[in-house]
Design a protein with these regions (language model features):
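Cationic, beta-structured binding surfaces that engage anionic biopolymers and membranes
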Residues: 1-178
């Protein structure tokens, strides 16, 4: 290793960790050093209370035409009017991001401190007999792993896309507010 690279990566101290449920259909992404608690002593921080949540993600499979589409929805902390991100820290009284997502989807009131992302569904194309997604200028190879996410309130405005570029190469594109 080059001397200038030392300290850039420490496998024992990741910036983020992701955990999943036993069915591997739900994931939580947490930030190891909370923006709210980073200077607090450990006993007063959120380190033992779930840490700062960055995203709650749920995966499912949905029939579309003659195919099956992998779908995803995500709940992420929202933005304040000044553009700064909400810090989803348990010390600040914020519960689990999953609870905010579940409340909203069970017909409850939407939490204005979160943003909900949904999968843009592919459409069945009779000509190629396959599900297709338009990656708008990005050359993408067909794959069941390809997806696009949009804000729920703007379903045609893609803010994240993941696509197969070559045999073992994938690209992840994202923009504000991610």
């Amino acid at each position: 290793a080059r001397p200038e690279d030392s300290g850039l990566f420490d496998g024992n101290s990741p910036a983020f960790t992701m955990r999943f449920n036993s069915a591997r259909t739900e994931w939580r992404l947490v930030q190891e050093r909370c923006d709210n608690c980073q200077f607090a002593p450990p006993h007063m921080s959120c380190v033992r209370r779930g840490k700062q949540q960055v995203a709650f993600i749920r995966h499912a499979r949905t029939a579309v035409g003659d195919g099956i589409s992998n779908t995803m929805e995500a709940c992420i902390p929202g933005l304040y009017t000044d553009g700064s991100a909400v810090v989803w820290c348990p010390v600040l009284g914020r519960g689990d991001l999953a609870a905010a997502a579940m409340l909203y989807h069970s017909g409850g009131e939407r939490c204005h401190e979160t943003q909900h992302l949904i999968t843009r569904q592919p459409v069945w194309n009779e000509e190629v007999e396959s599900l297709v997604l338009d990656f708008k200028g990005r050359h993408v190879t067909s794959s069941a792993k390809n997806f696009q996410l949009a804000l729920e309130q703007k379903p045609t405005h893609i803010i994240c896309q993941y696509g197969k570029l070559a045999n073992s190469s994938f690209g992840l594109d994202f923009k504000f507010p991610m």
